[in-house]
Amino acid sequence: MSNGKESLSPSEMDPKDLPDVPAFQDEYTKEYMQSTEQVKDGYYPLISKTNGFTLHFPEDMVIDDTSNAQPDNHYESLIFHYENNDIAVMDEYIIHYLSPVSDIEWSKDYMNRRAGEELNFKKLEAVYENQYIEIAEIKDESTLTLVALIWNDNDQQTQIFTDIMCSKEIDKDECASLQDKEREKVIDVFKSIKFLDDKGK
């Protein structure tokens, strides 16, 4: 028999029953968490406020409270980063969800303007059927920015800018090595984004 806990969302559960990680101990972030069951080691399922998409959320990150969703569910911004700022390499994700948007070239042009340069998008193999993903990179002395455009056949899309930054104490070579490792984690999060239809599936 069920004890009732399985039917509760993390935001409704007793804090003592939640995983002892930033994603659930932060009051704002846990509102986005779909379940206390890991989707893979170190990652939990997040569902957006628009119910437009899910993703695998890193357990040691928190969502910025400037994130918001429009009441009509056509737009959402989702911003998250590591809770601990005193680490060697830090990520900040800025995700914009839009629906409906059918003109992908318009989206790329808009992202070029945001980046302040012409982005060289490259296709990646998508995990989910009828979804598409292209990414580009911007590199400067201390920051690697990964840019992703993800969309599907139902005119849903996310535009993502993720900065991977090294702390000032890290030298150039070590920074590049750390950013390479972090790049793989970031791309895995990109690929985990799954669009939902109006029935939440």
Question: Model-found features: residue ranges?
Answer:
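N-terminal targeting sequences that direct proteins away from the cytosol to non-cytosolic compartments
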Residues: 1-72, 169-201
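Extended hydrophobic/Leu-rich segments
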Residues: 28, 98-101, 124
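Short small/polar-residue motifs
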Residues: 29-31, 58-64, 76-77, 115-122, ...
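Short, exposed beta-strand/loop patches in secreted or surface proteins that constitute
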Residues: 36, 46, 70-71, 80-81, ...
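Secretory pathway targeting signatures of secreted, lumenal, and periplasmic proteins
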Residues: 44-106
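A contiguous binding-surface segment within folded domains or other stable secondary-structure elements
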Residues: 101-120
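Short Gly/Thr-rich strand-loop-strand
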Residues: 115-137
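Short, well-structured beta-strand
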Residues: 129-201
